[in-house]
Amino acid sequence: MLADELTIGPIRAVPMDITPKYVGIASGLMNAGSAVADIISPIAFGIIIDKTGNWSLPFYGSVALLVIGIFLTFFMRPDKSL
């Protein structure tokens, strides 16, 4: 969880670099996506654990999403505005 928290500050700065004209909209979309994930993830975790009985499986999914996010971050180009 510490590594996840280390991304919060830098990822909030990304919209300012990529979309300076629409930084409010981009930040709002990021915040909305985070809120939706915060609502859905406990429900999804519960369903997965109930169906499989495996407590590790939901965490593997979380790690997979984090790795996908890391991979996609390499394609962000702050030197090119949208």
Curated annotation (Swiss-Prot):
Superkingdom per UniProt: Bacteria
User: SUPFAM superfamilies attached here?
Assistant: MFS general substrate transporter (SSF103473)
Q: Does the keyword Glycoprotein apply?
A: no
- Any Gene Ontology CC annotation: plasma membrane
Its localization reads:
Cell membrane
Instruction: Give TM segment ranges.
Output: 29-49, 55-75
Q: Which PROSITE patterns does the entry link to?
A: MFS
Read off the Pfam families from this record. Answer: MFS_1
Q: How does it sit in the membrane?
A: Multi-pass membrane protein
Task: Identify the InterPro entries for this entry.
Answer: MFS (IPR011701), MFS_dom (IPR020846), MFS_trans_sf (IPR036259)
Q: Which GO terms describe its molecular function?
A: transmembrane transporter activity
Q: Which UniProt keywords apply?
A: Cell membrane, Membrane, Transmembrane, Transmembrane helix
Name used for this protein in its record = Putative uncharacterized protein YjhE
> What lineage does UniProt assign to this protein's organism?
Bacteria, Pseudomonadati, Pseudomonadota, Gammaproteobacteria, Enterobacterales
